[in-house]
Regions:
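Beta-rich carbohydrate-recognition modules and glycan-binding surfaces
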Residues: 1-154
Length: 154
């Protein structure tokens, strides 16, 4: 997935805590170096999260995922959803350092959750993934910004 390509931006969407009455805001912004996911997290009205998402398919045999990103020092989650368990979110934490970094994620790093709580779920396989996203939550408030350049399966 090439986040420097403007067509990628068109295929992404935002899901914030306003789906549950929260007041957090976020947006996606095009940039030649890569797409920005940025906004403001508020815990008012029981809120406290923002996410961007996109449909994706990984090839059979994918062993890990690599994300090239430039961040703000905050904690994010790379989230995956599958066709086998569409209501389950598989999440792997990372701190987005304020310089270009390649973050590598293998299957063992992803924990199954439902609305942020750990649950038992089918075993994750990258070949079952239909949606990917970046989530910021976990009690963090205030402004955030992460720039995404590429996401690759290896």
């Amino acid at each position: 997935m090439d986040f420097t390509n403007r067509n990628t931006l068109r295929d992404c969407w935002i899901v914030n805590d306003n789906v549950m009455g929260g007041l957090s805001q976020s947006s996606l912004r095009e940039d030649p170096q890569g797409m920005f996911f940025e906004g403001q997290i508020s815990r008012e009205n029981n809120g406290g999260f923002a996410s961007m998402r996109s449909a994706i398919r990984f090839p059979q045999g994918t062993q890990h995922i690599e994300l090239l990103a430039n961040g703000d020092g905050k904690r994010y989650k790379l989230i995956l959803r599958t066709e086998l368990a569409p209501r389950v979110t598989y999440a792997a934490d990372f701190v987005a350092l304020p310089s270009w970094q390649t973050y590598q994620f293998n299957l063992g790093q992803f924990k199954s959750t439902f609305r942020g709580r750990a649950i038992d779920a089918p075993t994750l396989s990258f070949s079952d993934v239909i949606e990917i996203g970046i989530l910021i939550s976990d009690g963090q408030t205030g402004s955030f910004a992460i720039q995404l350049q590429t996401l690759q399966s290896k």
